[in-house]
Amino acid sequence: LSGKMQVFTGERGDYHRTRLTHTQEVASLARTLSRALRLNEDLVEALALLHDIGHPPFGHAGEDALDECLQPDGQFSHNQYALTIVEDLEERYPGFPGLNLSYEVLESQITRVDKTARSHYPLLEAQVVDAADSTTYDAHDTDDAIKLELLTLDELSEMSLIREALAAVNSEFTNLDATQLRASVVHYLLNRQVSDILATSAEDLLRYDFQSSDEARHGELVVRPSKELQEQKEELEGFLYERVYRHPELLKMRQRAQDRLQAMFLKYQTHPEWFPKKYLSLIHISEPTRRKR
C-alpha cells in the first residue's frame, strides 16, 4: 500500500497520504473507538488493515480503469479483490492458499463487497472500521488539499464543520502561523468526530442492549455519527468532491494514470508470460474464467 495513492497522484509531490498511511491512521482510530466501546480490538485492527488492501495503483481512478478493461466479461472491485488476495494470492502455508483468516474477518469483508445487497448490518467491529475510515478521510483529505494548495482555509470556512473548527481553535489559541492553524483544525476535526461517534454509539448500544453478535447483525446501524454531524460531514464531502476530487488538475492526472494502467493491462493480457512466476499457474485456467478474473 505504501506506493499507492489515495486521492492525489505523486505528481503533486510526496507530502500527502498514501493508502498505507491512511490504513495506519484508520487502524489507530478504529482501535481507539473499539476500546472505548469495549469491542474486540484485535478483530477491529485486522479489519482496518484489510479494508483497503485490494486497491490498485492510483486509487479510485485505477479501480475505474481496471473495471473498464474487464467489461463486458467481468468487473473490478477493490473490496472483492481484497478477498482474492487473502484467500487465493497470498501463499503463507504449504497446504492451502490464502491467509487462513477467521470467519469474522472474511464475513466483514464480504459485507463491504456489495453494501446494497446486505440482508443485515455487519458486525459492530466492522461498523467501527467504517466509521473510522469516514472520520479519517474527511479530516485528512481536507489537510492534504490545503497542503497541496488546492483549497484554502478561507474557502473551506464556507462549510459548517470547518467554521466550527476554526472558531474553536481561534478561541483557544492566538497568533498561530498557517501550518499550526491547519494542523489544529485537522486535530479538531478528528476529535469532534470521534467524540460524537462515541457518544451516539454508546447511547444506541445501551438502548438496544444486544445480547449476542447475531442480534447486533440484525439490528440497526449502531456505530455512527449523530444526525447533526452526519449532515456536516455530507456538506464537507460534497464540497471536497466538487472542489478537490473534480479539480481540473487532478482530473488530468487521473486520466494520465488511467491511460497508463489500461496500457499495462493490455500488455499483460497479450503477454501473460510477463507475470511473476508465482502467478502464472493462476493464469492457466479455462479462458472464460480467466477473462472474468
Give residue ranges: language-model regions:
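Active-site flanking loop/helix segments enriched in acidic
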Residues: 1-21, 116
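C-terminal subdomains that position terminal phosphate/3'-OH groups for nucleotidyl transfer/ligation
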Residues: 176-281
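Sequence-structural signature of the catalytic-core scaffold of metal-dependent phosphohydrolases
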Residues: 1-3, 24, 28-31, 35-36, ...
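Single conserved hydrophobic/aromatic residue that forms the stacking wall/gate
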Residues: 283-293
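Alpha-helix N-cap/helix-initiation motif
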Residues: 15-19, 55, 75, 121, ...
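Alpha-helical phosphate/pyrophosphate-handling elements in metalloenzyme active cores
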Residues: 12-43
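Acidic (Asp/Glu-rich) catalytic motifs at the cytosolic membrane interface
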Residues: 50
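Active-site alpha-helix of zinc metalloproteases
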Residues: 46-47
